[in-house]
Amino acid sequence: VTVTISPAELADLPAIAALLEEMDRFYGTTDFEPPADRVTQIQAHLFRDHPTAFVLLARADHQVVGLASYSFLWPAVGLTQSLYLKELYVVASHRRQSIGQALMQRLHAVAAETGCSRVEWTADAGNAGAQRFYAELGYKVADKLFYRVEGEDLNR
């Protein structure tokens, strides 16, 4: 199987929407907006003058089988920027085929090309598969805590 990694394009919107829905189902989401709304939201974030985020897509035999979504954060070490990986997902049928590793390697290249001093991300504490994947690639757990405010708490 030949795998290619490339930046998402406008024509990829339906595939991105389907992949994100599959990922959300993997994490237990059961309530979804209509597909057309999802495509509109994705387009609004990825394909505007100053995108909120960027997506790399993995394709196997011309079929989208994985994605990495990321943004840039500033400041990082020495007033550089960091690349923040928000989501890394590979469809179940294509896991354990080095696709996730290929996406991570491409992220490393993007970070280097854009002057980032590091790549950072989180993994769910209960996602043993993700933790095993990152450990197999030699990544170390950072000594950080992750905080979140959401929903109605944003109004206080």
Model-derived regions: residue spans:
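A short beta-loop-alpha structural element at the N-terminal edge
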Residues: 4-18
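Conserved GNAT-fold acetyl-CoA-binding loop/helix
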Residues: 17, 21-44
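A short helix-loop-beta-strand connector motif used in the catalytic cores of GNAT acetyltransferases and
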Residues: 45-56, 84
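Conserved beta-strand in the GNAT
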Residues: 57, 63-72, 89
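A conserved beta-turn-beta hairpin within the catalytic core of GNAT-like acetyltransferases
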Residues: 73-85, 95, 142
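Conserved acetyl-CoA-binding loop-helix of GNAT-fold acetyltransferases
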Residues: 90, 96-109, 132, 136
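Conserved active-site alpha-helix within GNAT-family acetyltransferase domains
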Residues: 101, 113, 125-143, 149
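Conserved GNAT acetyl-CoA-binding A-motif
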Residues: 112-122
